[in-house]
Design a protein with these regions (language model features):
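Mid-chain, well-packed structural core segment of small domains
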Residues: 60-96
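Non-catalytic interface/targeting segments
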Residues: 1-54, 86, 92, 96-126
Length: 126
């Protein structure tokens, strides 16, 4: 059984019922969901890292180092999107999901589109 670690930018305290963070780089934390065979195996949280320690790519590298394979986001700039592509993390667009649970369900149902440059923003809070 191969599992996938999915990161979802979230508001405090995180978890499946937490609201999604509007912008990946400025979220309170990431809810990490381990998925295998279409089921949630585990849920954990990971604090975000300050931008000062590596700029916009600090969160990208932080998530790559812990083995995240997929990120579901509602918003991000072009630079971090390119960074995720470079480190091999697939980025999906949250497509209006309000909670982590809704985002994960969208992923499991194949309803989340690839996060393309059409979804990028100029950065900052949403």
């Amino acid at each position: 059984m191969t599992s996938t670690i999915v990161a979802i930018p979230s508001t405090h305290p995180g978890g499946l019922d937490a609201p999604l963070g509007a912008h990946f780089g400025h979220c309170d934390l990431y809810t990490l969901v381990k998925i295998a065979d279409g089921k949630v195996l585990d849920v954990a949280t990971l604090p975000n890292v300050p931008h000062q320690q590596g700029g916009c790519l600090a969160p990208v590298n932080h998530l790559a180092q812990i083995g995240v394979q997929v990120l579901i986001a509602g918003g991000m700039g072009m630079r971090p999107l390119m960074g995720f592509n470079q480190v091999g993390i697939q980025v999906l667009f949250g497509n209006g999901a309000q909670t982590v649970r809704e985002a994960v369900e969208g992923l499991l149902q194949g309803k989340l589109p690839q996060f393309t440059t059409d979804f990028t923003c100029g950065g900052g809070a949403h």
